[in-house]
Regions:
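Acidic-glycine-rich active-site phosphate/pyrophosphate-binding loop
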Residues: 28, 48-61
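C-terminal helix-cap and adjacent tail motif
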Residues: 118-149
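N-terminal amphipathic, basic helical "cap/leader" segment at the start of enzyme domains
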Residues: 1-49
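Glycine-rich, charged/polar anion/phosphate-binding loops
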Residues: 38-41, 106-109, 130
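Short, electropositive alpha-helical surface patch
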Residues: 106-119
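Short, surface-exposed loop/helix-turn segments at secondary-structure junctions
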Residues: 26-35, 65-69, 109-110
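Small-aliphatic-rich amphipathic alpha-helix that forms the alpha element of a beta-alpha
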Residues: 54, 60-107
Length: 149
């Protein structure tokens, strides 16, 4: 234990816009050469939707007793805990994995490590109105009970 197989990168203040213009917008344009100026502008300003954006990175540490999968789960738990903590303090918070979470060029820029993977970006900000509740699965369809006979 105690490996901490994850990293946290915080974007706040001007770093949100700098990263957007220097990397997100530029990379989006490379991937979508026919994208409209409005679409590129949207990507450049994506991180401005919240006061703070937290990037959680799964960064497995070689270990003979702990499988990679468990380390990846640890990174996801970090995301969920940040989300729950922010919401419990009254902030609006959302965990997103959009195109840039899976882009190897963006991941390399952020981590400088080919083995790292982005677990998600958590947007945290002031709650202006109550967010819409998403459709959730019916518990009876996803929960079962094992009983020994």
């Amino acid at each position: 234990g105690a490996l901490s197989p994850w990293k946290i990168i915080v974007f706040k203040g001007k770093s949100r816009q700098t990263f957007g213009k220097s990397f997100l917008g530029k990379r989006f344009k490379e991937l979508n050469p026919s994208a409209s100026e409005d679409d590129v502008f949207y990507e450049e300003n994506r991180f401005l939707r919240a006061g703070v954006v937290v990037c959680v990175v799964s960064s497995p540490v070689p270990h003979k007793k702990i499988p990679i999968w468990e380390m990846q789960l640890s990174s996801a738990a970090v995301c969920q805990n940040i989300l729950l903590c922010a919401q419990s303090l009254g902030y609006a918070a959302q965990w997103l994995t959009e195109w840039y979470s899976y882009d190897q060029v963006i991941t390399q820029e952020l981590t400088n490590n080919n083995n790292d993977r982005i677990s998600g970006f958590i947007y945290i900000g002031k709650k202006e109105n109550e967010p819409k509740e998403r459709i959730r699965p019916e518990l009876s369809k996803v929960v079962s009970y094992w009983e020994e006979f």
